[in-house]
């Protein structure tokens, strides 16, 4: 059986949540972002592991329903927030029926909220009001944010003023200071007529880089999954653990003669007799086709781990690695990303970010859950 697999580590998710909480004041709550099927990790595996988060954030109604189904199966009730809000009046009404919190970022959503209100004791009676402080993606601009807030509070709603850092991964970027200043000013203005208004500004990068801006809620995303949220420190330096291991196996081994080429377009050729292995994964599984300088982890017959170069072109179902001088057997497991190499390292080689690699994995690899990592071996 082809053994390409995605292994999710719930213990790593739980550990990362604790690391995030250790950065916060005790009163600051964590909204665990589980949109896009929990960044490719799977709602069913992720939500139970993150059950000690204060709530869950999703992008759309179908994701909210999936999270609710898992929570219902655990007999647990937690806030679920639609961070893009309702996409129609009908969705707004469904959100009220299921008590999903909603973000409001444009006038039409505001109109729905004013015309169709939930009960005062529902969680969804607290609106996550989005303020565009500089990302220019979603949210009310400077000239509308206060009037939108006033309309909602006059109607009896509670508010969480929300914005999103554009450059929090780069602590020195000048836009950060401008966004913080705008957010603080708007929050102060709103609290004049609605003193109980809460604030939520920080994503994963903001949690680590702007500890004085945590306010009442943080929205933790990529850090929960063990990937690096900031530019100047690795995930390991932040004590984050990878929550996903992508693995395959050695499916063939060949000894090339000098001058033999491999793969499509013959991009790599042996300069002398050379041993290579074929690995059972490709872009049909979601592994990136272009990975300049990427390595994989392979264990030799003595149990020692080695980082081996990918050579030639990644195809739909397989690619080749350089194992010259190593004693490697067919069916040996190959780690594409996990503890080493990390997904951040692979993303850099692919010219993208870890988020995309997590989310682009296809349904072909089998999925499994493992509470602990395999015993670690030192690299040779």
Walk through the language-model features, giving the residues of each:
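Terminal domain-start leader segments
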Residues: 23-25
